[in-house]
């Protein structure tokens, strides 16, 4: 919660003191990254829910401010804190209305980390919405290009629709479970003891699947992502593509499948084919791009297909691979968009036809971008390779043999689909 505290501190600093504003934000995000590293290194694999913070908020409604970490979210929280710190480091290109930008950036970071750490259904959703609102404003006010307002409106429309569908699904879970608390662990335990009616699960799960899916850019609801990222400030693109986008995937793993397993079995076959569409169509669109940000954005959307396929397998191998690719892609997307922002500052253009000779002009940045491309291609030695290979095995064992064959062909094809 340090970034939210930093946003309040920054709001009291005069706007003329840009250096102090940046230092406060950098300090808060840096300390958050250090604390998340300590938590990650001291996490006990068999220890269940750890690092808990729980305050009773509205006892009559069963609302509690409940944070914690387990095997599902500890790696995502650590990745999110690292990406948040990196995004602050890359926000030096903001030169006007600096105070307002950093207030919103701190709120976005706090919302992102809070959403993944929340163990209460209400705060899980609240923190995500808290992070989304600054995204729209930052693209519209500090974005790049003539289409930034259109991009801001489009991302607002799509993500609001996704959030609304997810909210209806979450309310459905709460009502059908006849719960007296919003605690996610308690809800899961209650559903295990007395499962939600199967007919109810068959309409609750698609609401969650498509609601969370839109937030992740599931095909065909994906067109907001490349446009939004190409227009967004560097820090915003890094944070959203790297971390906030994983909220929907995390929601499916944490909530949708455990609370509506029968509905999941009914709908996950459809999700697997939509995942294939992410890989195929978005990969082909990425190959056609000349703008570096559009390439990275479409490539990022294509990567989501692997994660959706891992989730659709509905087995421990696939879910483990999905979480691993979520973490790897978060770091990869943040690195790619951060370097893209650096290239834009140096060249005032992201036209790839004019960007030859990067290694000669900028050896460090060029080498880092080369590593990002290699990781995006899933070469052995990078986390993407291990995660995606695991997902292939899981999808095959789950019966998605044709989809797995097609995915493997796309994975090994000599196209530059995964430069980002």
Task: Report each predicted region and the residues it spans.
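Transmembrane helix-loop-helix hairpins at membrane boundaries of multipass inner-membrane proteins
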Residues: 9-103, 180-193
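Hydrophobic alpha-helical transmembrane segments of polytopic
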Residues: 2, 25-28, 32-35, 73-76, ...
